[in-house]
Swiss-Prot record:
Its EC number is 2.7.1.167, 2.7.7.70. The keyword Cytoplasm does not apply. The lineage of its organism: Bacteria, Pseudomonadati, Pseudomonadota, Gammaproteobacteria, Chromatiales. In the N-terminal section; belongs to the carbohydrate kinase PfkB family. This is Bifunctional protein HldE. One of its GO terms (cellular component) is cytosol. It comes from Nitrosococcus oceani (strain ATCC 19707 / BCRC 17464 / JCM 30415 / NCIMB 11848 / C-107).
Length: 473
Protein backbone atom coordinates (compact mmCIF):
# COMPACT_ATOMS: atom_id res chain seq x y z
CA UNK A 1 0.00 0.00 0.00
CA UNK A 2 2.98 2.33 0.37
CA UNK A 3 3.06 2.96 -3.38
CA UNK A 4 -0.62 3.59 -4.04
CA UNK A 5 -4.17 2.88 -2.96
CA UNK A 6 -5.08 -0.40 -1.29
CA UNK A 7 -7.53 -2.85 -2.83
CA UNK A 8 -10.62 -1.53 -1.10
CA UNK A 9 -12.78 -4.21 -2.70
CA UNK A 10 -11.37 -6.70 -0.19
CA UNK A 11 -12.52 -4.57 2.76
CA UNK A 12 -15.61 -5.56 4.76
CA UNK A 13 -16.78 -2.65 6.91
CA UNK A 14 -19.60 -2.43 9.45
CA UNK A 15 -20.87 1.05 10.39
CA UNK A 16 -23.20 1.65 13.32
CA UNK A 17 -24.33 4.98 14.72
CA UNK A 18 -26.59 7.99 14.38
CA UNK A 19 -28.10 7.94 10.89
CA UNK A 20 -29.13 11.40 9.70
CA UNK A 21 -30.86 12.78 6.63
CA UNK A 22 -29.18 15.97 5.44
CA UNK A 23 -31.57 18.13 3.42
CA UNK A 24 -30.53 21.16 1.40
CA UNK A 25 -32.87 23.81 0.04
CA UNK A 26 -31.07 25.99 -2.47
CA UNK A 27 -32.40 29.38 -3.47
CA UNK A 28 -31.82 33.02 -4.25
CA UNK A 29 -32.35 35.98 -1.98
CA UNK A 30 -32.50 39.64 -2.92
CA UNK A 31 -34.83 41.25 -0.39
CA UNK A 32 -35.76 41.41 3.29
CA UNK A 33 -39.13 40.15 4.49
CA UNK A 34 -41.68 42.86 5.40
CA UNK A 35 -42.79 40.59 8.27
CA UNK A 36 -39.43 40.45 10.09
CA UNK A 37 -35.80 41.48 9.49
CA UNK A 38 -34.92 38.22 7.74
CA UNK A 39 -34.07 37.43 4.10
CA UNK A 40 -36.71 36.03 1.77
CA UNK A 41 -35.40 32.95 -0.07
CA UNK A 42 -36.88 31.94 -3.41
CA UNK A 43 -36.33 28.16 -3.39
CA UNK A 44 -34.93 26.90 -6.69
CA UNK A 45 -33.86 23.37 -5.79
CA UNK A 46 -33.96 20.68 -3.13
CA UNK A 47 -31.45 17.94 -2.40
CA UNK A 48 -31.22 15.05 0.09
CA UNK A 49 -28.00 13.33 1.19
CA UNK A 50 -27.22 10.68 3.82
CA UNK A 51 -25.61 12.25 6.89
CA UNK A 52 -24.01 11.10 10.12
CA UNK A 53 -23.34 7.36 10.11
CA UNK A 54 -25.08 7.29 6.72
CA UNK A 55 -22.45 9.61 5.29
CA UNK A 56 -19.70 7.42 6.77
CA UNK A 57 -21.19 4.38 5.05
CA UNK A 58 -21.54 6.23 1.74
CA UNK A 59 -17.90 7.32 1.92
CA UNK A 60 -16.79 3.73 2.52
CA UNK A 61 -18.91 2.49 -0.40
CA UNK A 62 -17.54 5.24 -2.68
CA UNK A 63 -14.07 3.74 -2.27
CA UNK A 64 -15.29 0.37 -3.49
CA UNK A 65 -15.46 -1.42 -0.12
CA UNK A 66 -18.35 -3.57 1.06
CA UNK A 67 -20.28 -1.78 3.80
CA UNK A 68 -23.20 -2.61 6.10
CA UNK A 69 -24.99 0.15 8.02
CA UNK A 70 -26.88 -0.30 11.29
CA UNK A 71 -28.90 2.50 12.83
CA UNK A 72 -32.21 3.86 14.07
CA UNK A 73 -34.70 5.77 11.92
CA UNK A 74 -38.35 6.64 12.11
CA UNK A 75 -41.24 5.33 10.05
CA UNK A 76 -41.72 8.55 8.12
CA UNK A 77 -41.06 10.11 4.72
CA UNK A 78 -37.50 11.01 5.70
CA UNK A 79 -36.80 7.36 6.54
CA UNK A 80 -38.01 6.25 3.12
CA UNK A 81 -35.82 8.88 1.48
CA UNK A 82 -32.79 7.68 3.47
CA UNK A 83 -33.33 4.04 2.58
CA UNK A 84 -33.56 4.92 -1.11
CA UNK A 85 -30.46 7.14 -1.05
CA UNK A 86 -28.36 4.55 0.76
CA UNK A 87 -29.43 1.70 -1.49
CA UNK A 88 -28.58 3.80 -4.54
CA UNK A 89 -25.07 4.37 -3.14
CA UNK A 90 -24.43 0.65 -2.66
CA UNK A 91 -24.87 0.54 1.13
CA UNK A 92 -26.38 -2.61 2.66
CA UNK A 93 -28.79 -1.32 5.32
CA UNK A 94 -30.05 -2.87 8.55
CA UNK A 95 -32.03 0.10 9.83
CA UNK A 96 -34.48 -0.26 12.71
CA UNK A 97 -37.65 1.72 11.95
CA UNK A 98 -39.24 3.13 15.10
CA UNK A 99 -42.91 4.19 15.10
CA UNK A 100 -43.74 7.62 16.51
CA UNK A 101 -40.07 8.68 16.28
CA UNK A 102 -38.84 11.29 13.80
CA UNK A 103 -35.93 10.33 11.58
CA UNK A 104 -32.95 12.53 12.49
CA UNK A 105 -33.05 15.31 9.89
CA UNK A 106 -31.04 18.49 9.37
CA UNK A 107 -32.50 20.97 6.89
CA UNK A 108 -30.12 23.65 5.63
CA UNK A 109 -31.24 26.65 3.58
CA UNK A 110 -28.47 27.75 1.19
CA UNK A 111 -28.17 30.87 -0.94
CA UNK A 112 -25.11 31.80 -2.99
CA UNK A 113 -23.18 28.96 -1.36
CA UNK A 114 -23.87 30.41 2.11
CA UNK A 115 -25.89 28.62 4.78
CA UNK A 116 -28.62 30.94 6.05
CA UNK A 117 -30.25 28.70 8.64
CA UNK A 118 -30.34 25.08 9.81
CA UNK A 119 -33.47 23.39 11.12
CA UNK A 120 -33.12 20.15 13.13
CA UNK A 121 -35.88 17.54 13.38
CA UNK A 122 -35.20 14.91 16.04
CA UNK A 123 -36.66 12.94 18.94
CA UNK A 124 -34.75 11.44 21.86
CA UNK A 125 -33.77 7.80 21.60
CA UNK A 126 -33.88 5.74 24.80
CA UNK A 127 -31.49 2.89 25.71
CA UNK A 128 -34.08 0.29 24.72
CA UNK A 129 -33.98 1.61 21.16
CA UNK A 130 -30.23 1.04 20.91
CA UNK A 131 -30.53 -2.41 22.47
CA UNK A 132 -32.81 -3.40 19.60
CA UNK A 133 -29.78 -3.22 17.30
CA UNK A 134 -27.63 -5.66 19.32
CA UNK A 135 -28.83 -8.91 17.67
CA UNK A 136 -28.26 -7.46 14.19
CA UNK A 137 -24.89 -6.09 15.31
CA UNK A 138 -23.73 -9.46 16.64
CA UNK A 139 -24.73 -11.12 13.38
CA UNK A 140 -23.23 -8.43 11.15
CA UNK A 141 -19.85 -8.64 12.94
CA UNK A 142 -19.11 -11.98 11.32
CA UNK A 143 -16.59 -11.66 8.53
CA UNK A 144 -16.08 -7.92 8.97
CA UNK A 145 -12.61 -6.37 8.76
CA UNK A 146 -13.40 -3.32 10.91
CA UNK A 147 -16.30 -1.70 12.76
CA UNK A 148 -16.88 2.06 12.74
CA UNK A 149 -18.95 3.65 15.51
CA UNK A 150 -20.25 7.04 14.36
CA UNK A 151 -21.41 8.89 17.47
CA UNK A 152 -23.25 12.19 16.96
CA UNK A 153 -24.64 12.14 20.50
CA UNK A 154 -28.20 11.50 19.30
CA UNK A 155 -28.75 8.33 21.34
CA UNK A 156 -28.07 5.39 19.03
CA UNK A 157 -24.77 4.62 20.80
CA UNK A 158 -25.80 5.06 24.43
CA UNK A 159 -23.85 1.96 25.48
CA UNK A 160 -20.77 1.76 23.23
CA UNK A 161 -18.97 -0.50 25.74
CA UNK A 162 -21.22 -3.42 24.79
CA UNK A 163 -20.47 -2.87 21.11
CA UNK A 164 -16.72 -2.62 21.79
CA UNK A 165 -16.76 -5.80 23.89
CA UNK A 166 -18.60 -7.79 21.23
CA UNK A 167 -16.14 -6.61 18.59
CA UNK A 168 -13.12 -7.50 20.70
CA UNK A 169 -14.53 -10.99 21.34
CA UNK A 170 -14.30 -11.76 17.62
CA UNK A 171 -11.09 -9.80 17.05
CA UNK A 172 -12.57 -7.02 14.91
CA UNK A 173 -10.92 -3.56 15.27
CA UNK A 174 -13.27 -0.88 16.59
CA UNK A 175 -12.91 2.68 15.23
CA UNK A 176 -14.88 5.48 16.86
CA UNK A 177 -15.69 9.06 15.86
CA UNK A 178 -16.43 10.29 19.41
CA UNK A 179 -18.81 12.84 20.86
CA UNK A 180 -19.13 14.64 24.19
CA UNK A 181 -16.84 15.51 27.08
CA UNK A 182 -16.48 11.98 28.45
CA UNK A 183 -14.45 9.49 26.42
CA UNK A 184 -14.33 6.84 29.18
CA UNK A 185 -17.14 4.85 27.57
CA UNK A 186 -14.89 4.32 24.54
CA UNK A 187 -12.37 2.39 26.67
CA UNK A 188 -10.89 -0.57 24.85
CA UNK A 189 -11.59 0.66 21.33
CA UNK A 190 -8.85 0.31 18.72
CA UNK A 191 -8.67 3.98 17.72
CA UNK A 192 -10.77 7.11 18.20
CA UNK A 193 -10.69 10.21 15.97
CA UNK A 194 -11.70 13.36 17.90
CA UNK A 195 -11.25 16.78 16.37
CA UNK A 196 -9.16 19.30 18.29
CA UNK A 197 -12.16 20.95 19.99
CA UNK A 198 -13.51 17.58 21.15
CA UNK A 199 -10.05 16.51 22.33
CA UNK A 200 -9.45 19.70 24.33
CA UNK A 201 -12.92 19.43 25.87
CA UNK A 202 -11.70 16.20 27.48
CA UNK A 203 -8.02 16.93 28.28
CA UNK A 204 -7.98 20.73 28.51
CA UNK A 205 -6.27 23.37 26.34
CA UNK A 206 -3.18 22.39 24.36
CA UNK A 207 -1.26 25.61 23.61
CA UNK A 208 1.47 23.84 21.66
CA UNK A 209 2.28 20.57 19.90
CA UNK A 210 4.27 19.19 22.83
CA UNK A 211 1.34 19.51 25.24
CA UNK A 212 -1.01 18.01 22.66
CA UNK A 213 1.25 14.96 22.27
CA UNK A 214 1.74 14.54 26.03
CA UNK A 215 -1.96 14.83 26.86
CA UNK A 216 -2.89 12.69 23.88
CA UNK A 217 -0.55 9.90 24.93
CA UNK A 218 -1.94 10.02 28.45
CA UNK A 219 -5.48 9.73 27.09
CA UNK A 220 -4.50 6.89 24.74
CA UNK A 221 -3.10 4.89 27.65
CA UNK A 222 -6.04 5.64 29.96
CA UNK A 223 -8.50 4.39 27.33
CA UNK A 224 -6.32 1.39 26.36
CA UNK A 225 -6.37 2.46 22.72
CA UNK A 226 -3.93 1.16 20.14
CA UNK A 227 -3.95 4.58 18.50
CA UNK A 228 -5.41 8.07 18.78
CA UNK A 229 -5.91 10.31 15.75
CA UNK A 230 -6.55 14.01 16.45
CA UNK A 231 -7.84 16.05 13.50
CA UNK A 232 -6.68 19.65 13.82
CA UNK A 233 -8.31 21.56 10.96
CA UNK A 234 -5.87 23.84 9.19
CA UNK A 235 -3.03 22.36 11.29
CA UNK A 236 -3.56 18.90 9.80
CA UNK A 237 -3.62 15.70 11.87
CA UNK A 238 -1.63 14.06 14.66
CA UNK A 239 -1.43 10.27 15.02
CA UNK A 240 -0.35 8.78 18.35
CA UNK A 241 0.21 5.04 18.01
CA UNK A 242 1.34 2.58 20.65
CA UNK A 243 5.06 1.85 20.26
CA UNK A 244 5.61 4.51 17.58
CA UNK A 245 6.73 8.13 17.46
CA UNK A 246 4.02 10.78 16.95
CA UNK A 247 3.14 11.51 13.33
CA UNK A 248 2.17 15.08 12.41
CA UNK A 249 0.62 15.57 8.97
CA UNK A 250 0.04 19.05 7.48
CA UNK A 251 -3.36 19.75 5.99
CA UNK A 252 -3.87 18.81 2.34
CA UNK A 253 -6.79 21.22 1.85
CA UNK A 254 -6.26 23.63 -1.05
CA UNK A 255 -9.45 25.56 -0.36
CA UNK A 256 -11.85 25.16 2.55
CA UNK A 257 -15.38 25.52 1.24
CA UNK A 258 -17.45 23.54 3.76
CA UNK A 259 -16.29 21.39 6.71
CA UNK A 260 -19.66 19.59 6.99
CA UNK A 261 -19.00 15.85 7.24
CA UNK A 262 -15.20 16.13 7.17
CA UNK A 263 -14.96 13.93 10.27
CA UNK A 264 -17.14 11.32 8.55
CA UNK A 265 -14.73 11.25 5.63
CA UNK A 266 -11.69 10.87 7.89
CA UNK A 267 -12.99 7.86 9.79
CA UNK A 268 -14.49 6.20 6.70
CA UNK A 269 -11.23 6.35 4.72
CA UNK A 270 -9.25 5.39 7.82
CA UNK A 271 -11.52 2.39 8.36
CA UNK A 272 -11.54 1.27 4.74
CA UNK A 273 -7.75 1.51 4.52
CA UNK A 274 -7.24 -0.47 7.73
CA UNK A 275 -9.76 -3.04 6.54
CA UNK A 276 -7.77 -3.41 3.32
CA UNK A 277 -4.58 -4.18 5.23
CA UNK A 278 -3.01 -0.77 5.74
CA UNK A 279 -1.10 0.33 8.82
CA UNK A 280 -2.33 3.15 11.06
CA UNK A 281 0.16 5.53 9.47
CA UNK A 282 -0.74 4.54 5.90
CA UNK A 283 -4.46 4.79 6.65
CA UNK A 284 -3.96 8.21 8.27
CA UNK A 285 -2.08 9.49 5.21
CA UNK A 286 -5.06 8.54 3.02
CA UNK A 287 -7.58 9.99 5.48
CA UNK A 288 -5.66 13.26 5.49
CA UNK A 289 -5.75 13.42 1.69
CA UNK A 290 -9.47 12.65 1.68
CA UNK A 291 -10.21 15.37 4.23
CA UNK A 292 -8.39 17.87 2.04
CA UNK A 293 -10.64 16.92 -0.86
CA UNK A 294 -14.00 16.88 0.92
CA UNK A 295 -13.68 20.31 2.57
CA UNK A 296 -13.50 21.74 -0.94
CA UNK A 297 -17.05 20.51 -1.63
CA UNK A 298 -20.39 21.98 -0.55
CA UNK A 299 -22.34 20.13 2.11
CA UNK A 300 -22.21 16.49 3.12
CA UNK A 301 -20.07 14.83 0.47
CA UNK A 302 -18.02 11.71 -0.25
CA UNK A 303 -14.60 11.09 -1.77
CA UNK A 304 -14.11 8.57 -4.58
CA UNK A 305 -11.19 6.27 -5.26
CA UNK A 306 -10.34 8.30 -8.40
CA UNK A 307 -10.21 11.52 -6.38
CA UNK A 308 -7.90 9.92 -3.82
CA UNK A 309 -5.69 8.51 -6.56
CA UNK A 310 -5.43 11.92 -8.17
CA UNK A 311 -4.61 13.60 -4.86
CA UNK A 312 -1.82 11.09 -4.22
CA UNK A 313 -0.46 11.32 -7.75
CA UNK A 314 -1.42 14.75 -9.15
CA UNK A 315 0.51 14.11 -12.36
CA UNK A 316 -1.73 11.13 -13.14
CA UNK A 317 -3.81 13.21 -15.57
CA UNK A 318 -1.38 13.11 -18.44
CA UNK A 319 -1.74 15.30 -21.50
CA UNK A 320 -1.38 14.37 -25.14
CA UNK A 321 -2.78 11.81 -27.55
CA UNK A 322 -5.36 9.56 -25.94
CA UNK A 323 -7.97 6.94 -26.72
CA UNK A 324 -11.66 7.62 -26.20
CA UNK A 325 -11.87 5.47 -23.05
CA UNK A 326 -8.72 7.01 -21.55
CA UNK A 327 -10.11 10.44 -22.31
CA UNK A 328 -13.30 9.76 -20.35
CA UNK A 329 -11.21 8.65 -17.36
CA UNK A 330 -9.06 11.79 -17.51
CA UNK A 331 -12.17 13.97 -17.75
CA UNK A 332 -13.65 12.37 -14.62
CA UNK A 333 -10.44 13.09 -12.71
CA UNK A 334 -10.36 16.69 -13.96
CA UNK A 335 -14.00 17.26 -13.03
CA UNK A 336 -13.38 15.86 -9.55
CA UNK A 337 -11.02 18.82 -9.15
CA UNK A 338 -13.68 21.26 -10.33
CA UNK A 339 -12.06 21.87 -13.72
CA UNK A 340 -14.03 23.23 -16.71
CA UNK A 341 -13.82 21.06 -19.85
CA UNK A 342 -13.70 22.74 -23.28
CA UNK A 343 -13.95 20.76 -26.52
CA UNK A 344 -13.52 21.50 -30.22
CA UNK A 345 -12.93 19.46 -33.35
CA UNK A 346 -11.60 19.61 -36.88
CA UNK A 347 -9.32 18.07 -39.52
CA UNK A 348 -6.28 20.28 -38.78
CA UNK A 349 -4.58 18.96 -41.92
CA UNK A 350 -1.83 21.58 -42.18
CA UNK A 351 -1.49 23.42 -38.89
CA UNK A 352 -1.19 27.19 -39.38
CA UNK A 353 -1.32 30.37 -37.21
CA UNK A 354 -5.09 30.57 -37.58
CA UNK A 355 -5.42 27.14 -35.96
CA UNK A 356 -2.96 27.99 -33.20
CA UNK A 357 -4.70 31.27 -32.31
CA UNK A 358 -8.12 29.61 -32.44
CA UNK A 359 -7.04 26.83 -30.07
CA UNK A 360 -5.40 29.33 -27.71
CA UNK A 361 -8.64 31.32 -27.58
CA UNK A 362 -10.67 28.17 -26.94
CA UNK A 363 -8.32 27.12 -24.13
CA UNK A 364 -8.87 30.45 -22.37
CA UNK A 365 -12.54 29.57 -21.94
CA UNK A 366 -11.85 26.80 -19.41
CA UNK A 367 -9.28 24.65 -17.64
CA UNK A 368 -8.89 21.74 -20.08
CA UNK A 369 -9.07 21.67 -23.89
CA UNK A 370 -9.97 18.56 -25.87
CA UNK A 371 -9.33 18.53 -29.62
CA UNK A 372 -11.19 15.80 -31.52
CA UNK A 373 -9.57 15.06 -34.91
CA UNK A 374 -11.08 13.43 -38.01
CA UNK A 375 -9.20 10.28 -39.02
CA UNK A 376 -7.79 9.94 -42.57
CA UNK A 377 -10.84 8.22 -44.07
CA UNK A 378 -13.14 10.82 -42.57
CA UNK A 379 -11.04 13.70 -43.94
CA UNK A 380 -11.04 12.12 -47.40
CA UNK A 381 -14.83 11.84 -47.38
CA UNK A 382 -15.16 15.49 -46.34
CA UNK A 383 -12.31 17.12 -48.30
CA UNK A 384 -11.73 14.90 -51.32
CA UNK A 385 -9.47 12.04 -52.41
CA UNK A 386 -6.26 14.13 -52.28
CA UNK A 387 -6.68 14.89 -48.59
CA UNK A 388 -5.37 14.71 -45.95
CA UNK A 389 -1.91 16.00 -46.73
CA UNK A 390 -0.65 14.88 -43.32
CA UNK A 391 -1.60 11.50 -41.88
CA UNK A 392 -3.67 11.15 -38.72
CA UNK A 393 -0.58 10.22 -36.69
CA UNK A 394 1.25 13.33 -37.91
CA UNK A 395 -1.69 15.62 -37.21
CA UNK A 396 -2.21 14.21 -33.71
CA UNK A 397 1.48 14.58 -32.87
CA UNK A 398 1.62 18.24 -33.92
CA UNK A 399 -1.58 19.17 -32.07
CA UNK A 400 -0.50 17.35 -28.91
CA UNK A 401 2.69 19.44 -28.85
CA UNK A 402 0.73 22.70 -28.49
CA UNK A 403 0.82 24.22 -25.02
CA UNK A 404 -2.90 25.06 -25.05
CA UNK A 405 -4.07 21.55 -25.95
CA UNK A 406 -4.58 19.02 -23.15
CA UNK A 407 -5.94 16.00 -24.99
CA UNK A 408 -6.10 15.00 -28.65
CA UNK A 409 -8.45 12.17 -29.61
CA UNK A 410 -9.30 10.79 -33.09
CA UNK A 411 -12.76 9.89 -34.36
CA UNK A 412 -13.81 8.03 -37.50
CA UNK A 413 -17.28 9.38 -38.24
CA UNK A 414 -18.03 12.36 -40.48
CA UNK A 415 -19.01 14.38 -37.38
CA UNK A 416 -17.93 14.08 -33.74
CA UNK A 417 -21.54 14.00 -32.50
CA UNK A 418 -21.26 10.57 -30.87
CA UNK A 419 -17.98 11.46 -29.14
CA UNK A 420 -19.33 14.81 -27.94
CA UNK A 421 -22.40 13.07 -26.50
CA UNK A 422 -20.09 10.82 -24.46
CA UNK A 423 -17.80 13.61 -23.28
CA UNK A 424 -20.51 16.23 -22.68
CA UNK A 425 -18.06 19.12 -22.33
CA UNK A 426 -18.92 22.17 -20.27
CA UNK A 427 -18.16 24.32 -23.32
CA UNK A 428 -18.29 23.23 -26.97
CA UNK A 429 -16.35 25.54 -29.30
CA UNK A 430 -16.57 25.86 -33.08
CA UNK A 431 -14.98 28.31 -35.47
CA UNK A 432 -16.63 30.01 -38.44
CA UNK A 433 -20.09 31.31 -39.25
CA UNK A 434 -22.10 28.41 -37.86
CA UNK A 435 -25.25 28.76 -35.81
CA UNK A 436 -25.52 26.59 -32.67
CA UNK A 437 -28.19 24.48 -34.36
CA UNK A 438 -25.72 23.49 -37.10
CA UNK A 439 -23.00 22.27 -34.73
CA UNK A 440 -22.72 18.51 -34.20
CA UNK A 441 -23.42 17.49 -30.61
CA UNK A 442 -24.65 20.94 -29.59
CA UNK A 443 -28.10 19.79 -28.49
CA UNK A 444 -26.66 17.19 -26.11
CA UNK A 445 -24.24 19.71 -24.59
CA UNK A 446 -26.94 22.33 -24.02
CA UNK A 447 -29.33 19.73 -22.57
CA UNK A 448 -26.60 18.83 -20.08
CA UNK A 449 -26.24 22.46 -18.99
CA UNK A 450 -23.23 23.27 -21.18
CA UNK A 451 -22.54 26.22 -23.48
CA UNK A 452 -21.91 26.60 -27.20
CA UNK A 453 -19.38 29.28 -28.18
CA UNK A 454 -18.56 30.22 -31.78
CA UNK A 455 -15.18 31.85 -32.44
CA UNK A 456 -14.17 33.72 -35.58
CA UNK A 457 -11.40 32.34 -37.78
CA UNK A 458 -8.33 34.45 -38.48
CA UNK A 459 -8.61 35.97 -41.95
CA UNK A 460 -6.02 34.94 -44.53
CA UNK A 461 -5.19 31.63 -42.87
CA UNK A 462 -6.54 28.40 -44.29
CA UNK A 463 -5.23 24.98 -45.25
CA UNK A 464 -6.70 25.34 -48.75
CA UNK A 465 -4.76 28.58 -49.32
CA UNK A 466 -1.53 26.93 -48.20
CA UNK A 467 -2.11 24.00 -50.56
CA UNK A 468 -2.82 26.38 -53.47
CA UNK A 469 0.40 28.32 -52.82
CA UNK A 470 2.42 25.10 -52.74
CA UNK A 471 0.89 23.94 -56.02
CA UNK A 472 1.52 27.29 -57.76
CA UNK A 473 5.16 27.28 -56.68
Amino acid sequence: MTHGLPHFTSAQVLVIGDVILDRYWHGTTSRISPEAPVPVVQVTGREDRPGGAGNVAVNVAALGAEVTLLGLIGADEAAAALRSLLAHRGVHCCLEGLPNIATLTKLRVISRHQQLIRLDFEDDFIPAHGEALLPAYSTALRGKSVVILSDYGKGTLQEPQRLIALGREVGVPILIDPKGADFSHYHGATIITPNLAEFEMVVGPCPDEASLVWKGEQLRQQLALKALLITRGEQGMTLLEQGHSPVHLPTEAREVFDVTGAGDTVISVLGAALAAGGTFKEATLLANQAAGIVVGKLGTASVTRDELQQALHPRAIRRGITSEEELLHFINLARSRGECIVMTNGCFDILHPGHVNYLAEARQLGDRLIVAVNDDASVQRLKGKNRPINSLAQRLTVLAALHDVDWVVPFSEDTPARLIERVLPDILVKGGDYTPEQIAGANAVVANGGKIIILTYQQGCSTSQIIDIIRKN
